Amino acid sequence: MSAVIPRIEQLSARVVRVLGCNPGPMTLQGTNTYLVGTGRRRVLIDAGERAVPEYIVSLREALKQHDTSIQHIIVTHWHHDHTGGVQDILAHFNTDAELRVSKLPRCPPQEEIIGDDKKKYSYLNDGDVIQTEGATLRVLFTPGHTDDHMALLLEEEQAVFSGDCILGEGTAVFEDLHDYMKSLQKLLSIKADLIYPGHGPVVHDAGSKIHEYIIHRNAREQQILNVLLENSGTAFTSSELVKVVYKETPEHLHRAAEFNLLHHLRKLLKDGKICLAEGSDEKKWKSNL
């Protein structure tokens, strides 16, 4: 168990973390939101969940402590523990009417609304640069966790705000394993010094953590394949496989684990290493080797 994350903490000369006050099995101690820059107006990365008054209190306190206001809100992806608080921030703070709230578009494109739909997202592109006093942020399209996921490179620190692509502890869930693995390789190529994750503590050895994620996913794929190879005459449902492959994982996390396992199975199916068993009312997989 990692150390308790304070509600507000200055992590560097240009980064202040404000905890989202929304702890849970998937959010760990809560969503990390970050005030970035050194001036009287700063960028807020991620906005926590909707209707969490404790977060609004913490954000107000952080802005007061650093004598600053919000210039621009950037959300790393569409999940509600990162976008939900936008509406509350707009409602509780005397923000500029022109305040931009930005993200990457969904793929395929779909309509996205903020609260009562009076404000629209401003869409960014891979490689875009956002500047504020004391900080330069470069957009990195990193799909996999979601189709619209971005990380942000803080150029002055060679640090990455990783959203939910990489967590401070444990491993991440994803929607598309192929895209996710490509995104990990992309982040590895950045050669960042540290990672400011969407959940959990700061990662100080970025390269090692990213390597760890890549190795873990490859090992998990091999583990799934080994179970099917060792039981070559048997077909398994995904829920049956979870109990074997994730036997060391707490049971309350098995649903999230099954989500990841299904993506591994789809990849293995595409690779021709496994096949779907015939004659069953539910999907069952078996080795094709």
From Swiss-Prot:
UniProt key word Nuclease: yes
UniProt cofactor(s): Zn(2+)
Keyword Mitochondrion: yes
Residues given in the record as Zn(2+) 2 binding sites: D81, H82, D164, H199
GO molecular function: RNA endonuclease activity; single-stranded RNA binding; zinc ion binding
Family matches, as InterPro entries: LACTB2-like_MBL-fold (IPR047921), LACTB2_WH (IPR041516), Metallo-B-lactamas (IPR001279), RibonucZ/Hydroxyglut_hydro (IPR036866), Sec-metab_biosynth-thioest (IPR050662), WH-like_DNA-bd_sf (IPR036388)
Coiled coil: none
Subcellular location: Mitochondrion matrix
SUPFAM superfamilies documented for this protein: Metallo-hydrolase/oxidoreductase (SSF56281)
Predominant localisation class: mitochondrion
Signal peptide (residue range): none
E.C. number(s) listed in UniProt: 3.1.27.-
Keyword annotations of the record: Endonuclease, Hydrolase, Metal-binding, Mitochondrion, Nuclease, RNA-binding, Zinc
Top EC class of this enzyme: hydrolase
Positions of Zn(2+) 1 binding: H77, H79, H145, D164
Cofactor notes: Binds 2 Zn(2+) ions per subunit.
GO annotations of cellular component type: mitochondrial matrix
Role this protein plays: Endoribonuclease; cleaves preferentially 3' to purine-pyrimidine dinucleotide motifs in single-stranded RNA. The cleavage product contains a free 3' -OH group. Has no activity with double-stranded RNA or DNA. Required for normal mitochondrial function and cell viability.
Family under the similarity heading: Belongs to the metallo-beta-lactamase superfamily. Glyoxalase II family.
Name recorded for this polypeptide: Endoribonuclease LACTB2
